[in-house]
A protein has these predicted regions:
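Non-catalytic scaffold segments within catalytic domains of secreted glycoside hydrolases
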Residues: 1-111
Length: 111
């Protein structure tokens, strides 16, 4: 739930009001390998919440979880969190739709 991220940001800012905040490893696993519209919606919703919080708090960075599909300690290779698909047999990388969305968002919002 995106509002949970806002709640966490507000909680941390109460304990460290003068410290810059960085959101790290925010993302979700998606069942679809390349076409991951659910992940794009997840990022849109969560970034909207981060933008609202940044109006009043010193949020300095946001990092997606993760660039590449990888080995997760608790889940092994079963869940894919990356915005780049990795074929574990061949190591071939393929940009997912979420990668392309991030790319267009960064270009669109660059100063």
């Amino acid at each position: 739930e995106p509002s949970g991220l806002t709640d966490a940001i507000n909680l941390v800012s109460r304990y460290a009001p003068d410290k810059p905040l960085y959101i790290t490893e925010n993302g979700m696993a998606s069942a679809n390998t390349i076409t991951d519209k659910d992940r794009i919606e997840y990022y849109k919703d969560h970034l909207h919440e981060v933008a609202k919080a940044a109006r009043n708090l010193p949020i300095k960075g946001y990092f997606a979880w993760s660039l590449l599909d990888n080995f997760e300690w608790a889940l092994g290779y079963k869940k894919r969190f990356g915005i780049v698909h990795v074929d574990y047999k061949t190591q071939q990388r393929t940009k997912k739709d979420s990668f392309k969305w991030w790319q267009s968002e960064l270009v669109r919002t660059s100063p």
